[in-house]
Structures are given as C-alpha cells and as structure tokens.
From Swiss-Prot:
It catalyses: [thioredoxin]-disulfide + sulfite + adenosine 3',5'-bisphosphate + 2 H(+) = [thioredoxin]-dithiol + 3'-phosphoadenylyl sulfate. Transmembrane segments: none annotated. One of its GO terms (cellular component) is cytoplasm. The gene is cysH. GO terms for biological process: hydrogen sulfide biosynthetic process; sulfate assimilation, phosphoadenylyl sulfate reduction by phosphoadenylyl-sulfate reductase (thioredoxin). HAMAP family: CysH. This is Phosphoadenosine 5'-phosphosulfate reductase. GO terms for molecular function: phosphoadenylyl-sulfate reductase (thioredoxin) activity. It is found in: Cytoplasm. InterPro entries: PAPS/APS_Rdtase, PAPS_reduct_dom, PAPS_reductase_CysH, Rossmann-like_a/b/a_fold. Catalyzes the formation of sulfite from phosphoadenosine 5'-phosphosulfate (PAPS) using thioredoxin as an electron donor. PANTHER family: PHOSPHOADENOSINE PHOSPHOSULFATE REDUCTASE (PTHR46509:SF1). It comes from Shewanella oneidensis (strain ATCC 700550 / JCM 31522 / CIP 106686 / LMG 19005 / NCIMB 14063 / MR-1).
Length: 245
C-alpha cells in the first residue's frame, strides 16, 4: 500500500482495517526488524515517534530506529520513581546515540501525589491502576497528542509476558499506527544485536533484573519466577501505557 492508502486506512471501517492489517502483517512477517523499521519510516503516515522506558534491553530499539531517523522523537514517561541507574542509563544512551529525547511527566509531582493519595502502588490492583494512569498513561497520551504522532514505534516483545503473546507487528490504535519491529525476538536475538553493535544492557541487568521500571515495583528475577512476576509485585504485568492508548 502507498502512504496515502495507509493514511486512508486509519479512517476505514473496522472490517476493512482488519483485512488490510492481516495482509500487511503477513508481508511484514517476512522482513527483518531493520527492514520493518525502514518500511515504517518510509510508508506509515504522520509524525513518527519511538517510546522507550529505557529498560533492560532498550538500547536495541533506540539504536535501530535512530540510526535511520536520527531526529525521531523518543518519548519517555518519567514517573519520578525510576532507579538512579535508569536516569544514568538515559543520559548515557541519549549522549551516545544523540537521541531527540522528549520527557513527559504527570502534572502532579511524585511527592505531591504521595501527600494527596498515599503510596498508590501499595493499595492493591486498583491503586496500581490509578498510579499508572497518572504517571504513565496520561503523560503518554499528552505526548502523542502534542507531538501529533501518526505512527508509534515501540519495542514490545511477545516473550516478555502472556499479555503480549498475540500482539501483531502492525496495529491501529485509535487514530494512529503502532509498529513493533522486534515483536517476535527472543532474549538471544536481543543479546546478539547488543553484542553486534557494542550496545549496553541497563546497569541493573548485572544485578539480576530482567525487567525494570519504578523502584517500588521492580525486583530481580529469582528462582521459579517468570519475567512478568518481577513487576508490580506480581499483581499485573502491564502499566496500561500500551493497552489504554
């Protein structure tokens, strides 16, 4: 499909969208991750942006996309509770890859939130969901709107959790496309890419973390645990950022 046809697909009936997306995803399945990035930047409409949590394996997508479009906005939602190592990792990769970093935060500071609501992450699933809406979902919605993003690139992978096992390479979320170039990659694929381009893992990887977010809801992988159990005290895997937008 041409760029104009892809743009028109955003407003097509759902049945048409579904049929065309199935066809496009069959095509994309035959491409490498790098080829998917090239295709997406060339054909998918609107402003492009890449979201990143600067997690354990974040350097893969940050490198892969920025090597093709150096000025692509990189959206980070900063909760104010990231690990010190994460902030250092952000600085390291931003400098090394010359990233066009765009940081978005909740309108209310973390200290003010605690004064008003208490520690929401300790208030069960409902508290976690409220915390995530305040600190991740709303800032990301604002970022996508302010940057007028028509195509959203992200580094989700099916092997990361059961909630991601059925995600397609390309989807339509509301009024924009969402492209997941490394969706079927394994941890080995990630390691090979990082090694090939001499890219670092997040510093906490060496301390046993396989997934890292906020200090209060991330912990190292222990014997018998799955990756998704290392986040949010095992209560949930997703913060909502990729599912409520």
């Amino acid at each position: 499909m041409s760029s104009s046809e892809l743009k028109a697909l955003l407003t097509a009936p759902k049945s048409v969208q579904q049929a065309e997306l199935e066809r496009i995803n069959r095509f994309l399945a035959g491409l490498t991750a790098q080829e998917r990035v090239l295709w997406g930047l060339a054909y998918l409409p609107g402003n492009h942006a890449l979201s990143s949590s600067f997690g354990i394996q974040a350097a893969v997508m940050l490198h892969m996309v920025s090597q093709v479009q150096s000025d692509i906005p990189v959206i980070l939602t900063d909760t104010g509770y990231l690990f010190p190592e994460t902030y250092q990792f952000i600085d390291q990769l931003t400098e090394r890859l010359s990233l066009n970093l765009k940081v978005y935060q909740a309108p209310i500071t973390s200290a003010w939130q605690e004064a008003r609501f208490g520690q929401l992450w300790e208030q069960g699933v409902e508290g976690l969901e409220r915390y995530n809406r305040l600190n991740k979902v709303e800032p990301m919605q604002r970022a996508l709107a302010e940057l007028e993003v028509g195509t959203w690139f992200a580094g989700l992978r099916r092997s990361q959790s059961s909630t991601r096992e059925e995600l397609p390479i390309l989807a339509i979320h509301g009024s924009r496309f969402k492209l997941l170039p490394i969706i079927e990659w394994s941890n080995k694929d990630v390691h090979l890419y990082l090694t090939q381009f001499d890219l670092p893992y997040h510093p906490l990887w060496e301390q046993g973390y396989v997934s890292v977010g906020d200090t209060h809801s991330s912990k190292p992988l222990e014997l018998g645990m799955t990756e998704e159990e290392t986040r949010f005290n095992g209560l949930k895997r997703e913060c909502g950022l990729h599912y409520e937008i």
